[in-house]
Amino acid sequence: MTTVAHAVGTALARLGVTTVFGVVGSGNFHVTNALTAAGARFVPARHEGAAAVMADAYARVSGGLGVLSVHQGPGLTNAMPGITEAATRRTPRLVLAAEATAPRSNFHIDQPALARAVGAVPERITSASAAAADLARAWRTAVTERRTVLLNLPLDVQAAPAPAPFDVPAPPAPLPPPEPDDAAIEALADALVAAGRPVFLAGRGARYADAELTHLSERTGALLATTAVSRGLFRGNPFNLDVSGGFATPAAAELIRSADLLVGWGCSLNMWTLRHGALVGHDTTVVQVDIDPDALGAHHRIDLGLVGDVATTARATARELDRRGCHSAGYRSVKIAERLAREGRWRDVPREEQPEAGRIDPRALSAALDDLLPAARTVAVDSGNFMGYPAMYLDVPDADGFVFTQAFQSIGLGLATAIGAAVARPDRLTVAALGDGGALMGISELETAVRLGLDLLAVVYDDEAYGAEVHHFGPDGHPVEHVTFPPADLAAIGRGFGCAGVTVREPGDRGQVAGWISGPRDRPLVVDAKVTRGQPSWWLAEAFRGH
């Protein structure tokens, strides 16, 4: 007898699922086994929360669907931070969760309500006869609408005989991306023609439109910038400002603030990207292009909003400019290019050292790592006071090389994010940049990294504190003993899991890291970097101004 659980798992593999993350319990045992029997790879994590984050990172880096398999009740609740991160970011994700529907079961919770509460879409396999249609609907929503879908699998339905044949309708062909009407394109072209200092700001929605935006920027003389999550999109372009917002270099911030036209492409223009509005000049015309009409003007005032796919809109605008015969140098000049070559990276910005005995400046650490690491790298960054250093000092080869965990601003997601990214791109060395607080929250997944044989470097910026809280409240005289901790030997903990482990306290210690990078890299390396603690990072100081 073929059960519904077996039929669902087999059908998912036939639909194209190749990789599944999760933790197996009795409720998701059979559907997971069916997936692997049909050819999918199952990546078992040590905790459901980590598995959820791995699936999110895998989807973001691979460009495919992330799939998570969890037990009913506590298996699902354990996974909620990662599910919330994905739902907030609108990562295409299918969560397979067993469901105890008996009200008196100790596993019973309102799982659909839980999904809705965090922005995910709840679906359910309602019966054996409807299972194929229910699965097709959940799949279609996840893939075509780029949503995180919780597909509940009631235990009794899973065990029921599946109808034969179990035919899941093929997903419909994707609809053509929306394009603004002619009047909107003409209005954007008018704004570009009138601008003398245009800046293009590309977000997550522009991830696959780099060629179109680069071409349009060359026609209009626009400088290029990205949100943090899209860092690397314009790497190598001499007019690339890198990241806007709190992470922006002084040169980038000045040039963005001086723009007379700011066009946001597939980005929300939120407080982080615009430094609470400080990067928008009083006379700057603001345009926003987004596929979601509700996103237009949601965070910042705009003068023109266009509902459309970024690549499609950029191509249409370029055609309109071609029709008009318009071409402008705009904001671009030899002087600007030379300035960006000198000042375009944070490591090129002069800094005062922060000496502290037995501790290394996180900026010096990050710059040294950038020099040591191979160019083919993926950088995954956890949340915390430290995060600007690896985010902006470690270069990345492209937008797929940077994975940021800030949609929900939960700490402790960095290591699992790196693992998911490493599974998606095993051809690149993956760097997990962590604070000590986040590292200790997710440290059990070091065993997963070892077991999978991942090419992974975990760098812990260890200030023995929740540094953001120390720097936020400490200067006002508040006690900070609840957010500071005694020293821990994180390198030794890493070795206990089977990793290599080194402690870095000064620049000379980087030789141990260099040896691992140039060696066979047959096991992950944990670097416990004891960083200086005297001042908040520059991005945190900017964030405090908005609180």
Regions found by a protein language model. Give the residues of each.
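N-terminal cofactor/phosphate-binding cores enriched in small/glycine residues
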Residues: 2-84, 88
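Active-site diphosphate/adenylate-binding microenvironment
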Residues: 5-8, 16, 23-26, 31-36, ...
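Glycine-rich phosphate/diphosphate-binding loops that line cofactor/substrate pockets in enzymes
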Residues: 7-17, 57-63, 87, 141-145, ...
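Conserved thiamine diphosphate
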Residues: 67-159, 256, 267-288, 424-485
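Glycine-rich, acidic loop regions that bind phosphate or pyrophosphate groups
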Residues: 96-134, 228-337, 473
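Thiamine diphosphate
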Residues: 104-106, 247-249, 256-258, 297-299, ...
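Conformationally flexible catalytic loops at phosphate/diphosphate-handling active centers
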Residues: 118, 137, 141-194
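Phosphate/pyrophosphate-binding active-site segments
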Residues: 129, 152-153, 164-165, 195, ...
